[in-house]
Amino acid sequence: MILPTTYMGSVEWYRLFLADPSAVQIEVMESFPKQTYRNRCTITVPHDSQSYCQSSIANSLTLTVPVKRADSKQLTRDVEISYQQRWQHQHWIALVSAYKRTPYFDYYADFFRPFYEQETRFLVDFNEKIHEVIVRLMANNVAIGNGLWAIGENRTADWQGLNLEPCFGIGQSILDLLFEYGPETPLALCRMG
């Protein structure tokens, strides 16, 4: 299966990826299409003091990694990130604001902070590094692949009791699930399918 590179990919993207990671290839030789999830993500932002999943009112916020001017024939692998704006600071503040009340933000924040303090030249490299962190955090205790989600050595995942709130919309970043469910994120992905 061929998937595009993504900036903190969507829940749907990770469901496809985690179904069989060994069968996935990330497309980097295509002409770079503008206004896609290759350099943007959508996160959920609460309006009140509750966790975003418990909030009665929540909005989506799109975060875009600015890229240096790319022409229509430039390959995705050659697209460079622009640092003329303070987008890293803005993205980090948005992530903190959106997720600071979630159960797992304090545990996982330090894994993501370096991406907003250091510069990476190419978008593909930046996306790949974030993807590796996300997969490592999700797969820490879970063997993933071939449709089997097993926890530990001898027990199959049981997601029957997992209460998924109706707050995870189409196109929302996997971070919505990761910061809310932590190590149970793969179970939440199964339940959504």
Where are these regions (language model features)?
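Residues lining hydrophobic/aromatic ligand-binding pockets adjacent to catalytic sites
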Residues: 1-193
